[in-house]
């Protein structure tokens, strides 16, 4: 349910049943990388919300929580959500402030229609993610790492007649 905030401004809300700690970790990391990060909320089912967050790497990261959002597709400040999640123990309704839909960079990935091409061992993904983080630290200046390094394919998976190339920027753990 959307509610009127100070001076009659309509604000967005997110009611979380479970999954708050994982969401808190993701959003806190995203804000640490980009204080102006945005969050977009998609009501996947009656009680499941996909929460997407922007990153400075042109990759959108996400977490799924049990909950209900005031408006499907609402975009809010990641910093505001992070602050609300710090104050909230595990479940409850969060006041996310005013919508900022215009700040979202593009379309979300489709909610359905995916198929598993292959499964990667978590140790491989973790090792690549750690190397990606080391790479970003090496280029900690305002320009960051060269996009050619971030866009470089680090894993190629094949299966069911499909080939998928995964670039480094998709594996950087935020």
What are these language model-derived features?
Residues 2-65:
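N-terminal ordered "arm"
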Residues 51-91:
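Hydrophobic/aromatic-rich structural module bridging two neighboring secondary-structure elements via a short loop
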Residues 79-161:
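Surface-exposed beta-loop interaction hotspot
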Residues 163-165:
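Ser/Thr- (and often Asn-) enriched beta-sheet segments in non-cytosolic proteins
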Residues 42-46, 70, 123:
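A sequence-level detector of short, solvent-exposed, charge-rich linear segments
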Residues 7, 12-15, 34, 46-50, ...:
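Acidic-enriched, low-complexity/disordered segments with a strong bias for Aspartate over Glutamate
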Residues 172-174:
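Conserved small/polar residues in nucleotide/adenosyl-binding loops
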